Amino acid sequence: MDEFESTKLSKVQFSTSVLSTPSNEGNNLIHRFKNSFKRNDSPAIQEGLLYSELSEEEKIQWDLANQPYKKVLDQRHLTMIAIGGTLGTGLFIGLGESLASGPASLLIGFLLVGASMLCVVQCGAELSCQYPVSGSYALHASRFIDPSVGFSIGINYLLMWLISYPSELVGCSLTISYWAPSVNPAAWVAIAFVLSMLLNLFGARGFAESEFYMSIFKIVALFIFIIIGIVLIAGGGPDSTGYIGTKYWHDPGSFAVPVFKNLCNTFVSAAYSFSGTEMVVLTSTEARSVSSVSRAAKGTFWRIIIFYIVTVIIIGCLVPYNDPRLISGSSSEDITASPFVIALSNTGAMGTRVSHFMNAVILIAVFSVCNSCVYASSRLIQGLATAGQLPKICAYMDRNGRPLVGMAICGAFGLLGFLVVSKNQGTVFTWLFALCSISFFTTWFCICFCQVRFRMAMKAQGRSKDDIIYRSTLGIYGGIFGCILNVLLVIGEIYVSAAPVGSPSSAANFFEYCMSIPIMIAVYIGHRIYRRDWRHWYIKRMDIDLDSGHSLEDFEATKLERDEDKKYVSSKPLYYRIYRFFC
């Protein structure tokens, strides 16, 4: 973008930012409620003068930077979304299948994926603080790599959330059926569906408040388990047989054979457990302060250490990897396969007392994922549509900042949850998930690579690092390391899919885990054919747009806030500066 175009866009940003969105007319409660669903027209469209002078690409960038979301999310919301978003069935139940590969394999797998996740969140926070747009991952890829890459990543990531929604609704139903097996499971699907949609109809505040309290419940439950686990390892407990320590690391051992293949087998389970951590970056458009996003991202290190690594070590000490109950669960929500329940049941009566509590924890965890699916998918749909990558109708926003069309599309996918009454629902969801099986790794790679490209473009165009609102603690090297690590994780997953542990190779098994790769390639090629662009395979560093994508006034205010915070932290004692470095 040349100097004239940059100045023109800045004028539009400044002149339109002072205009306010039209308020709901009338004082009648019913009238206000009805009006809240009307389209939230952009201030630029109302003024129309300078906006009409922009090119189509500039209009898209302006619309992305000025989306009419309500900035209602506080620091406490973002922190709990970042923590609670990852505490789901992947941790409470899925950990069991990974433990069957051996406690050392489980620990190494979680350390590798955790290191990748740390890089991803830091890179994502840097980009989202700089360019706070809805559907940020896909749109950042379109800005820093190539529009076709961005479209492919965006569709794949969106599919992951849309397909997860009905699956988690089924999970809610199966979990509740533990207490009421005689009730038609479709009834529980309907209740979970209505509740999750209603919470999101209250906007970002409704989603965030519900996530806040559900996350507190999950965190308390996990802390209780950690404390009980430490006591049991030390030889305490009502029916203790003495000190356990690392007994099961020696017999039956630390690694299941074959070692490397079992290690690779833990990657997808670990990724599924960590998935959702990056969602805190999606909230940047609705956060009261950009600094809240950066603070939440910084805390990722401690969340990984406390909630995953410590838990994995305790589970590995309390449950032998050859326990048949680890892989005997009838579904991904079967608490009998939960290593938490197995660990406590190994002590005698405690296991029967805790099963109902653990089922409640799993129910909260599964419903929390349902809630997140509606929130994340609707924002992704709205962002992609605003960027011109989906039909314009999908960009519809009402006056309360709710992407109603995006929510409706997610709700339509949610109706697949009623397949719970079908005998073939397991097969259906297995192949639906195959559509986005390892999209975790491809999305995470893309986030890290975008940050690397952003830093390279800043250097190539002679920009100062002071212009970066929030700099990743790991710098560009964290992005490079994250890229390499995610490529290795994908290679490991392809290997174990082609030659699975304990069963012969088959095309069905391979595509169950790797179908997303050819689908992403097909979407990429299809978008490139649609664009009819075969000359430019990537955006050159000098051509990357570093200026648009944020409101000028908000950008300057955020820089001022950042500088004041730096001065405040530098005036504090050493212990506080260390604390703020990590948190």
UniProtKB/Swiss-Prot annotation:
GO terms for biological process: amino acid transmembrane transport; S-methylmethionine transport. Residues 97-101, 165-182, 237-254, 320-356, 424-428, 495-505 are extracellular. The modification Phosphoserine is found at S6, S23. The chain crosses the membrane at residues 78-96, 102-123, 144-164, 183-203, 216-236, 255-274, 299-319, 357-377, 403-423, 429-449, 474-494, 506-526. Its main location: membrane. The keyword S-adenosyl-L-methionine does not apply. Keywords: Amino-acid transport, Endoplasmic reticulum, Membrane, Phosphoprotein, Transmembrane, Transmembrane helix, Transport. One of its GO terms (cellular component) is cell periphery. Belongs to the amino acid-polyamine-organocation (APC) superfamily. YAT (TC 2.A.3.10) family. This is S-methylmethionine permease 1.
